[in-house]
């Protein structure tokens, strides 16, 4: 797909993560399983974006209760292709998904999780 296409996986069950990684290899997308200790890092750093450095902080909170997937460096066609192939592969869905943007690139993973979880709860009640 593209050299910059990258998907970050947070608290994704190992078997499912392996399925996603296999799909991504076929599509030319890099993947990273983000460790709990890195949840306090900025998304730009976790996605390997130039100009972001690891901060001297370590996450001390609990594991996220839900899985989260963050897309970086993927245009809408790439994202659509990935999601279509994801469904075809019968990989169980991940409820919390986000695209890295100029706005949220400076957020910490834990902040994005909280925001997505709130939004997900609102949509579940609708």
Question: Which ranges hold each PLM region?
Answer:
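N-terminal, charge-rich interaction modules
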Residues: 1-50
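Helix-rich interaction surfaces within compact, conserved domain-sized segments
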Residues: 6-7, 18-19, 32, 79-125
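Short, intrinsically disordered low-complexity segments
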Residues: 39-68
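Mid-chain, well-packed structural core segment of small domains
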Residues: 58-89
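Short, charged/polar micro-motifs that form catalytic or ligand-binding hotspots
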Residues: 10, 68, 72-73, 98-102
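Charged, low-complexity, helix/coiled-coil-prone segments
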Residues: 22-31, 51-62, 96-103
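Noncatalytic linker/hinge segments flanking ATPase motor cores
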Residues: 47-54, 72-78, 108-117
């Amino acid at each position: 797909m593209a050299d910059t296409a990258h998907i970050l996986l947070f608290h994704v069950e190992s078997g499912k993560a392996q399925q996603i990684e296999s799909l991504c290899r076929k599509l030319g997308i890099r993947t990273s399983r983000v460790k709990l200790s890195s949840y306090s890092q900025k998304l730009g750093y976790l996605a390997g974006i130039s100009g972001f450095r690891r901060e001297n902080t370590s996450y001390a909170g609990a594991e996220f209760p839900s899985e989260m997937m963050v897309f970086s460096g993927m245009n809408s066609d790439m994202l659509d292709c990935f999601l279509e192939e994801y469904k075809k592969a019968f990989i169980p869905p991940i409820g919390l998904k986000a695209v890295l943007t100029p706005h949220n690139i400076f957020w910490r993973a834990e902040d994005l999780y909280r925001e997505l979880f709130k939004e997900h709860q609102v949509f579940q009640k609708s």
